[in-house]
Swiss-Prot record:
Pathway in which this enzyme or protein is active: Bacterial outer membrane biogenesis; LPS lipid A biosynthesis
Gene Ontology annotations of biological process type: lipid A biosynthetic process
Enzyme kind, highest EC tier: transferase
Protein name: UDP-3-O-acylglucosamine N-acyltransferase
Cited function: Catalyzes the N-acylation of UDP-3-O-acylglucosamine using 3-hydroxyacyl-ACP as the acyl donor. Is involved in the biosynthesis of lipid A, a phosphorylated glycolipid that anchors the lipopolysaccharide to the outer membrane of the cell.
Annotated keywords: Acyltransferase, Lipid A biosynthesis, Lipid biosynthesis, Lipid metabolism, Repeat, Transferase
Family listed: Belongs to the transferase hexapeptide repeat family. LpxD subfamily.
GO cellular component, one term: membrane
Subunit-level organization: Homotrimer.
Catalytic activity: a UDP-3-O-[(3R)-3-hydroxyacyl]-alpha-D-glucosamine + a (3R)-hydroxyacyl-[ACP] = a UDP-2-N,3-O-bis[(3R)-3-hydroxyacyl]-alpha-D-glucosamine + holo-[ACP] + H(+)
Any one Gene Ontology molecular-function term assigned to this protein's record: N-acyltransferase activity
Assigned EC number: 2.3.1.191
Catalytic residues as annotated in Swiss-Prot or TrEMBL: 233
């Protein structure tokens, strides 16, 4: 699709000089000359210097930062422009729905009744697929995998060897991503990335792992995930981490290896948890956490102004106590 066709089809108003063939939307640090990216926050401007993107949606006040080799597509709301453009690259669940009725043969694989399989699917030997599983186009499943009843694998999901997924889990569904108009309307961002699950991973029942906006949501080797867990788009879970039930990881959360999330932990988006860190149940995490540490703390919800006062009061009293304790220790030292 030509750039002009893309902009016209989705009513994106901007000027351009080179009407090139657009292949995809991509992250700045992974884009090619035939890709479009966007910048919605100033902290990403530093990525422009080394980016190979052919064009970037950007605000006028920041457009001077765009290298000459790249086109600046000046818009009022880059995130909204990106959301509109993403619809041109939506990948269907089944490209040809009629093909799911065609018989398919896989060597040394057990497939039980009422399994639905799309086109271009690969399944490794000794894998076991239980009734009611749905496998979309382009899915790759390794050796010795087990999919229990009603598991759904969205398009292009990759499971490496020895992956077990329990009943009702959904791998590769849309991430929860929307841009917003000036009137407060929500415009869906089509997620064109995938989920990759590395070897020796086990996932409990009714868990959802969303596919990436672009690139991969990645569950690394040896991770164990409990029932009823939500993992957002573009998350990366480090090797041999453990995620207990009802944990929610917002989009682009990343972790080192052997991290432990207690039940009902909630993580804000775009945060990193260092390796070998453990987080106690019901904790709410709103900042990066260093490696090799333990965290805990759960506060009931309250009105936001009350919460701000509470935090300020708690912090002030805690610091007073620290000072008092230090003074008492100092007095005791001089008396002795």
């Amino acid at each position: 699709m030509k750039l002009s066709e893309l902009l016209n089809a989705y009513s994106i108003e901007t000027e351009f000089s080179n009407d090139f063939e657009v292949h995809a939307l991509a992250e700045l640090n992974k884009a090619t000359p035939n890709d479009i990216s966007y910048i919605d926050q100033a902290r990403y401007l530093k990525l422009l210097k080394d980016s190979k993107a052919g064009a970037v949606f950007i605000r006028k006040k920041e457009s001077s930062k765009v290298p000459k080799r790249m086109q600046a597509l000046v818009v009022d709301n880059p995130h909204l422009a990106f959301a509109k453009a993403s619809h041109a690259f939506k990948i269907p669940f089944f490209k040809n729905p009629e093909s799911v009725n065609e018989p398919k043969h896989f060597e040394r694989v057990t497939i039980m009744p009422n399994v639905v399989i799309g086109e271009g699917v690969e399944i490794g030997e000794n894998s076991l697929i239980y009734p009611g599983v749905v496998i979309a186009d382009g899915v790759k499943i390794g050796k010795n995998c087990i999919l229990y009843p009603r598991v759904t694998l969205y398009q292009n999901t990759i499971l490496e060897d020895n992956v077990t997924i329990h009943a009702g889990s959904v791998i590769g569904g849309d991430g929860f991503g929307y841009a917003h108009t000036a009137l407060g309307e929500h415009v869906k961002i089509e997620h064109v990335g995938i989920v990759r699950i590395q070897k020796n991973v086990e996932i409990g029942a009714n868990t959802a792992i969303d596919r990436a906006v672009f690139g991969e949501t990645l569950i690394k080797e040896g991770v164990k995930i409990d029932n009823l867990v939500q993992i957002g788009h573009n998350c990366v879970l480090g090797e041999h981490s453990i995620v207990v039930s009802q944990v929610g990881l917002s989009g682009s959360t990343t972790t080192g290896r052997n991290v432990v999330f207690g039940g009902q932990v909630g993580i804000g988006g775009h945060l990193h948890v260092g390796e070998f860190t453990q987080i106690g149940g019901k904790s709410a995490v709103g900042k990066d956490l260093p490696p090799n540490t333990n965290f805990a703390g759960a506060i009931p919800a309250m009105e936001i102004h009350e919460w701000h006062h509470f935090l300020a009061h708690l912090r002030t009293n805690f610091r007073k106590q620290q000072k008092t304790s230090l003074l008492q220790k100092a007095k005791g030292f001089f008396k002795s």
